[in-house]
Amino acid sequence: MARYIFITGGVVSSLGKGLMAASLAALLQARGFRVRIRKFDPYLNVDPGTMSPYQHGEVYVTDDGAETDLDLGHYERFTGVSARQADNITSGRIYRDIITKERRGDYLGATVQVIPHVTDAIKDFAQAETEDLDFVLCEIGGTVGDIEGLPFIEALRQLHNELDRDQTCFVHVTLVPYIAAAGELKTKPTQHSVRELTGLGIQPDILLCRCEKPLPEGERAKIAQFCNVRKSAVIPALDASSIYAVPLQYHAEGLDGEVLRHFGLTAPDPDLARWEDIVDRYQNPEGEVTIGVVGKYVGLQDAYKSLNEALAHGGMANRVKVRVKWLDAELFEKGDDEIAAQLEPMHGILVPGGFGERGTEGKIASVRFARERKVPFFGICLGMQMACVEGARNTAGIAGASSTEFGPTDEPVVGIITEWMTAEGLEKRSEGGDLGGTMRLGAYEAHLAGNSHVANIYGSTVISERHRHRYEVNVAYKERLEKGGLVFSGMSPDGLLPEIVERPDHPWFIGVQFHPELKSRPFEPHPLFKGFIAAAVKQARLV
């Protein structure tokens, strides 16, 4: 029998509900329970695939091709359980499915309403495919009181009423702000947030109180009294030195124990040795490297959330601190002096994915710098494409090389993928098609050349990686690019789609069409990030 933990947020957004859900799931998992985490997103987009990175942050892609919220990345990294399409739902998808059914006549003439049709769809989502689980943690996006979130709150209220009393637990994440002028933590915002939640029919069982100062016992007692919870169920959640220290901190404050107490369960103490190990690696590095990330969305680091974490994983694997220098690609279009000034201090250069023409000449310039100066280079998605364009222009003699994504070109070294094979059959796309849900998404196999650098890094010649792209390096240019020094060391199984390029005449120069950062985990750092940081460590010793 699955038990459900519903996680809501109050007072303000960005309190860390996703990290809290991931940390609690990791603690329950460490006690021997089977867990899965799900995310309810109240926005009306069908998925975040067409949303601006500045609005939404990173789009996290699952093995089965779902474009989801970045919180699912936290879920995977903390639990090691691969997320699926079935773990993320949006209001947009719910309404689309309901309207499709209504047009088809599935409701037999009934009036379609928020209650019961929308709330039933939410409840069905929460309970789907849970037979083999002990705990299902459901995070509700946004803040209690948001208009778009009301159907989700109502659905959870109904679900609590329909399930056995020992099957549900409500955890409310709230803010206890510190007022410096008064020198006090204020509990009133938490009281009002809980009052709003109870007004919607839900009494929280546990309060997780985010605060920047330790929560005094007197304030915990006050919150417990006014919010109608046990004092032991008021859990302080102070800022942590690293997100990977959060599970240890929550365990020390008794969060997982309080959850088990609520459900009337007993379990062995959690084995947290591996969490203690990675926190030790993070807090006590034996060296330091600086990585320059030349991107388009550097004003919002959430746009590169998994990338940032994967670099940290590579650092922990090599016992070094990774300092990330976020560099706006457009600045590199001003000339060589600016490029040299920004990139010379770097021990490694990474060009991540992105869409559109803006900043691409700056990315190409940074690739050239890395190639000529023999600085470790890692290109991901658009970064690989720009590495191929740079190689075409400067080492293969194809002066007008470009991408059709940026406009008409006589030398389309990069072009739109018109068709590719999936498990279901042949997928086809056209230049003028819809943007949403039409990319090459999810996990695909690649075959690696046996004597290549990447095969040595992976320790295998067959790999599976997650993709999210509409454009691809044009295989018709493969022979000319290889004459210029680029080696196509990874291809799709049919040999038509380039997946990896590298330069044998360079200490560490690799471009990949996929997104390896999506599969990196703190306990299993992705081999490419582990290798990239190792190369940066060697570079740091040379300068």
UniProtKB/Swiss-Prot annotation:
Belongs to the CTP synthase family. CTPSs have evolved a hybrid strategy for distinguishing between UTP and CTP. The overlapping regions of the product feedback inhibitory and substrate sites recognize a common feature in both compounds, the triphosphate moiety. To differentiate isosteric substrate and product pyrimidine rings, an additional pocket far from the expected kinase/ligase catalytic site, specifically recognizes the cytosine and ribose portions of the product inhibitor. Homotetramer. Residues 1-265 are annotated as: Amidoligase domain. Keywords: ATP-binding, Glutamine amidotransferase, Ligase, Magnesium, Metal-binding, Nucleotide-binding, Pyrimidine biosynthesis. It catalyses: UTP + L-glutamine + ATP + H2O = CTP + L-glutamate + ADP + phosphate + 2 H(+); L-glutamine + H2O = L-glutamate + NH4(+); UTP + NH4(+) + ATP = CTP + ADP + phosphate + 2 H(+). Allosterically activated by GTP, when glutamine is the substrate; GTP has no effect on the reaction when ammonia is the substrate. The allosteric effector GTP functions by stabilizing the protein conformation that binds the tetrahedral intermediate(s) formed during glutamine hydrolysis. Inhibited by the product CTP, via allosteric rather than competitive inhibition. The active site is at 381 (nucleophile), 515, 517. CDD domains: CTPS_N (cd03113), GATase1_CTP_Synthase (cd01746). GO terms for biological process: 'de novo' CTP biosynthetic process; pyrimidine nucleobase biosynthetic process. NCBIfam families: PRK05380.1, PyrG. Pathway: Pyrimidine metabolism; CTP biosynthesis via de novo pathway; CTP from UDP: step 2/2. CTP binds at residues 13, 146-148, 186-191, 222. Catalyzes the ATP-dependent amination of UTP to CTP with either L-glutamine or ammonia as the source of nitrogen. Regulates intracellular CTP levels through interactions with the four ribonucleotide triphosphates. GO terms for cellular component: cytosol. GO terms for molecular function: ATP binding; CTP synthase activity; glutaminase activity; identical protein binding; metal ion binding. This is CTP synthase. It is an enzyme of class 6 (ligase).
